[in-house]
Amino acid sequence: MSTSLLFEQLNFLILVAAEAELPIAHSTRKLLMDNSCNNCQIYELYNENLKDVKTDKDWFMNKFGPQTVHFVISNTINFPFYKIVYFDLLIPVVSHTWVQDSVKTKRHLRTNMYSPNPFHLLRDCQVYISKSSFNKCEYILYSDLLHLLGGTLVNYISNRTTHVIVQSPQDPIIATVSKLTFGSFSSSSTNKHTEKPLREWKFVYPIWILYHFKMAKPLKGELATLCELDMQDTSEEQLFAKWEEVIGDKQTSSSQLTLHPNKTLFKNHHFAISPDLNFFTPLYWFLKGFIEDLDGKVTPLSFSDDLKSVYQAFPDIDCYIGHSANSPILEKTKSIKPEIHVGNVSWLFYMFALQKFTPVSQCKLIHQPFHAKLFTSKELTVAYTNYFGSQRFYIQRLVEILGGLSTPELTRKNTHLITKSTIGKKFKVAKKWSLDPQNAIIVTNHMWLEQCYMNNSKLNPKDSRFQNFKLDDNMGWNIGQIGMDHSSLPTPKNLSMVTYDTQSISEKPPPTNDQMDQINDNTNVLSKKDGTPISSFENSIDEKIDKLQKISGEVAVTHSGDLERSFVSRPSRASFPVVDSKKSNLQKKDSNSDISMETEVFCEGHEKREEKEFTKPITEYDAPKKQEIREQSRKKNDIDYKKEEEETELQVQLGQRTKREIKTSKKNEKEKETNECHIEVDQMTNEKQGEESTGKLISTEDVTSKKDTDKFSHLFEGLSDNDDHINDEKPAVNSKYTTPKTSQNITSGVDTPTTAQTQVFMPSSGNSRLAKTQAAKRLHTDIESLNEFQKNFKRKRIDSEEISLSQDVERSNNNKELATKAEKILARFNELPNYDLKAVCTGCFHDGFNEVDIEILNQLGIKIFDNIKETDKLNCIFAPKILRTEKFLKSLSFEPLKFALKPEFIIDLLKQIHSKKDKLSQININLFDYEINGINESIISKTKLPTKVFERANIRCINLVNDIPGGVDTIGSVLKAHGIEKINVLRSKKCTFEDIIPNDVSKQENGGIFKYVLIVTKASQVKKFTKLINDRDKNETILIVEWNWCVESIFHLNVDFTSKKNVLYQKKNN
């Protein structure tokens, strides 16, 4: 029976090296299950022959996945996949004692202290490395060595800190720490007692870490004393003397690889060391000696080197070690040797841990030279939860190189909480704080940090991809699994992720002042400041208006004298977002990813911070509220969207109509001019053709004028497609409005044939000028009409959005009211569980729940869904017993099914919550007491397998008779949920052999896969189908069953071909 929720949602793997360890393994497993662990597997190493098995990451994930393994429990590291587990997947490996002590203390203890790795000499140490003494390159190297030795790096000093690493007695941190007190602070006004620190910190030189690393054993005696700070060491000569002892110590050099036998790790590899690794000289000697002791070669580079000559002199250089990704040395190196391996110091120690040379492309993000900082510490102050062991170090390093700070506790000073699941107090508190508009904290997952760094740009942490807190469902989503081999992933522009800081677009040179002025003028037609594209409908309207005004502008150029005062052309649309030139320049500037040199001192229980640090609003990113409201209303209101589509259609029709009328008007004017020529010709020749033509043209104009009733139909009048003064782009602009000519268009547009006399008598220039002048005069009215149309259109759209917004506000207020009621009811409990159940109900709760109870369940992590949808990722079923309903049968296909519970769980839970008893510490409801009888752990565990029940039985295609009770749709959906790929419905009365589909037997090795599988309801159907198949394919295997056979297989999640129950006919290979 479960006694606590200590290991809730956590998965464990217990490794047993010898049979004698089995009792302790089962005892540990029982302890884990009693404290609510999600899953615990026992793997007997002594029964497995893994010598010929490639135990790589894929093997481990397939063997023990797909869900994340949070902890591996083993008293030894002598198993073949230790390095994959600990260094690659970043899964802590702890002894059995960790479980026992964690249960005793009721908290997850630090995993380093319980590591079975003998090289973790500093497992009991919490070390602060002074940022005043060391530059960023040295800080990275020392922290990497500390992590490799199992120590814990802290960026604050507390009473748990054991060591402080400094370079000299003059380090300012020494004076700061010596003044620290814990408990009550001295105060003359309150006369509070001042307590002394709970421990004496040891101040040590960095050689303390180097000696541990080189000797691979604890320091004792004179060596330990040598590493401790001596306040008398005031001269550089004295400090150098200590370094020379550790660098030149032959004993330590020879024992460096005691526990790491691969002494030829860097054989055939030549390392070029970049000058941007600004090391203290003795530290460079140490690094050089480290590489050479592992059979590698080293060539230092300098900024004055002719790199081409260096690489020609040493053609075997194949590795580059540097600090900054923006170094000019690195840029030149890549151009000369594009195939070179480019890494940083962390990469060297990572390979040392793996005992294998590994290209940077197969390592972690943090193993390449670092990008410039993206954030400031005010923008990125991170707390984290639900990460263990090396995962915390990885987050700390990512945050550091992004420019931020990480803190152990969650306070109002934090800007972000990083988590991969929804359990824990930090998550609940952060979610509450996230609702505070003045000082909201953003809850996001670790993929946000990784993607920001990998893409070298600030991404929106509220993007749906970074709001996925179910990352434990897939081991491939573990932190640190995005490596440099993913560097070709899409950039933020085409990621469906919204870039929320425009200064990240810094690849292009910053715009000039003139360009910035133009950009600022065009702000009203750019995409939104948050990067979201403007809707296609707005674009289509703007494009149409642009086209009209472009035509008008071209006419205005031709007739500048007439239009100078009456028309101002619309500014052209910018094709890039607004970028602050100052921000752009700052972004482009190389900051070399400096790690903040601030020294933070945390006093537990009494954190010394100024009040303003807690109350100052933290600005994450600003999107215009008006645009946000419109975006929300578009997403939430299908009615508005349909109205917009109707308006768009009307606009297109308007464009088509105006285009036709342009053509009509244009040709009428031409024919009128031609007609005047004919009149003059008639007067000279006395012919009647001109009079007839005139009569026809007048009648055509009358018809056109009657049709011209639309308010905006005159917009294109007077603007001829063939006007010589319009440039060649004109037809392309108007091509969108071109419509096929109707018979009427053709009639009205027939040109009068011209004769030789017509060519002699050209129309007067006055008539041409008259037409153009009229067109120019109408431009005022045209633009006013357009503006009026825009206003009307926007007014309609805003009105509909306001209606939708009022509905949203009402709904939001109702939700807040329900949430408040639920919180008030739950307030009498000190602790609230997060059950993380997404469930459907069958055979119970027919009347549903009231709104307050639904909100209460939601706040406890229980969500009830009406129907089963694959996208909802359901993991629970509520039913009074095992049922044959569609929902129950499908629930056994959930990936995974975590619980099959009786409805009494909900009833008792709500009963306890609504009881009038005194305030309770926690809700005393045990999930395991409500499990449905018959759905045991063995069945639950099978839902975590990567394949479904019928898929495992090699049944992928099945034939189903059309008269099956329940209906073919329902039965078919259940079968598909459990692995059937193709379902063929047979009409038993009119069925032929060709109607029966065979099963997929392509993977058949030694027989055993039935070629024909059928589900029938009558004995007569069996006789008919067996005859059809045996007559045409008599040598093939057949399986004919009742529906009950499928149901039994689903209930057990196993197909038993040896059982004859519900099998009507079976034919196997001889």
Swiss-Prot record:
Which SUPFAM superfamilies does UniProt cross-reference here?
A: BRCT domain
In-chain residues carrying the UniProt-annotated modification Phosphoserine: 304, 591, 593, 720, 800, 806
Q: Which residues carry this modification: Phosphothreonine?
A: 532
Q: Where is the composition biased (Polar residues)?
A: 735-753
Q: Where is the composition biased (Basic and acidic residues)?
A: 580-592, 603-615, 622-645, 722-731
The keyword Transport belongs to this UniProt entry's keyword annotation: no
Region annotation Disordered: residue ranges?
Answer: 572-659, 722-753
What post-translational modification does the entry describe? Phosphorylated by MEC1.
**This protein's record includes keyword Mitochondrion:** no
The UniProt entry, under Pfam families, shows: BRCT, PTCB-BRCT, RTT107_BRCT_5, RTT107_BRCT_6
Query: What UniProt keywords are attached to this protein's entry?
Result: DNA damage, DNA repair, Nucleus, Phosphoprotein, Repeat
Q: What else is known?
A: Present with 1380 molecules/cell in log phase SD medium.
**Record's function text:** Required for resumption of chromosome replication after DNA damage, specifically in S phase. Is recruited to chromatin in the presence of RTT109 and RTT101 in response to stalled replication forks and acts as a scaffold during DNA repair.
The subunit structure is:
Forms a complex with the cullin-RING ligase (CRL) RTT101(MMS1-MMS22). Interacts with MMS22 and RTT101. Interacts with histone H2A; requires H2A to be phosphorylated (gamma-H2A). Interacts with RAD55.
Query: What's the protein here called?
Result: Regulator of Ty1 transposition protein 107
Q: Which organism is it from?
A: Saccharomyces cerevisiae (strain ATCC 204508 / S288c)
Ranked from the top, the taxonomy reads:
Eukaryota, Fungi, Dikarya, Ascomycota, Saccharomycotina
Its gene is RTT107
